[in-house]
Amino acid sequence: MLAFLVIFGIIFYMNESKGKLHPVTQITNDMVRIFGDMGFSVAMGPEMETEWNNFDALNVPGDHPARDMQDTFWIKTDGKPIIDELGHSLRPVMRTHTSPVQIRYMQEFINSGKNLEDETIAIIAPGKVFRNEATDATHEAQFHQIEGLVVGKNITMGDLKGTLLEFFKRFIGPDAEIRLRPSFFPFVEPGLEVDVKVGDRFIEMLGAGLVHPNVLENAGIDSTQYSGFAFGMGIDRLVILKTGISDVRYLYQGDLRINQF
């Protein structure tokens, strides 16, 4: 049904049929709802980050290949170092993951006077991230991730496994299975790759682990008293899993045929 609106004597015809959410938005909303039901709150952060929040505070070594120009979109400056009063590099970078939200949230939590003895941090952080890499059917220069962080007293690997298993049971179905494999990420120790069983095979789905003590200390949290776990997964990958879209680039081409999903 068509309706019309008259503005300054000009008639604008409008289709009253409702629009449709993009598949990435649909899946993000589903994940936020599920994690919300599990007790997580949503935290957000800027897409343009500092070198400190994106790398240094997350225990990423100075010579780590992720910092190379061919992997990261660094923002041009006048070439002079940008350092704060604590000696942290404020060199701007388009964030390469949603993990910087961990640092920002933990610092704000401590600075606000909150106490981990009384309250456990449990957040998710969905958002867009950027990688300076060639695009193909499974890679894009921009994509979406969701970060999870829990910090408190006596947080264990069992808590991590139970949280992820419960999420996938709600997201995929009650028969969902996960498999944990040892891996390495500088911001967690130990680190894990998490595979999810889809049909008769396991698919690599996300990275996770217990928050590295250095990361907790960099955020102002005593790592001898508190522990935590973190995980990060690609939302686009879950969109492909749910919809069967064969090429991640289809999600960002503005093609209205994507509305079929």
What are these regions (language model features)?
Residues 7-11:
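Short, positively charged and aromatic/hydrophobic N-terminal segments
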Residues 13-261:
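TRNA-recognition modules of translation machinery and tRNA-sensing kinases, especially anticodon-binding
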